[in-house]
């Protein structure tokens, strides 16, 4: 596997983010448009996204490691924002690329990290969720671009564990009282 063309401008910040993830004992995965570019069809994206299994108490340590990798906060109130939203808003200093790290704590997120795999992209290796888990996360986000991303991942991986996808998407749909999370993507698997 090589770095998809639309993602080549992100090699430097992605390398720094992966180094940060490695320093965090690989307790996370790269998600979002970057993951879609490797597991589905490459597309334009404006930022890098990751999910780390971390409590807000671990944020100071993550920020210190991030600084050593050339990654800095995008806001002066990063601790307050992280406590309220469970997201770290960061920036790769050299490239200016935005990096958002979600702080995961749910059992599903623990499974995503445990099932994650390292993909060799030639000039770098990155830790990604399985195609199934990326689809589940995209179904929950449920923006129009996420539905397109889901289709590209399905097209690239014909032997998906649809039972796992259905189970988790329906579980989140029930909790969020949004049945369309599953019904909007169900036909894509046929």
Which residue stretches match the model-derived regions?
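Compositionally biased terminal segments of proteins
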Residues: 1-190
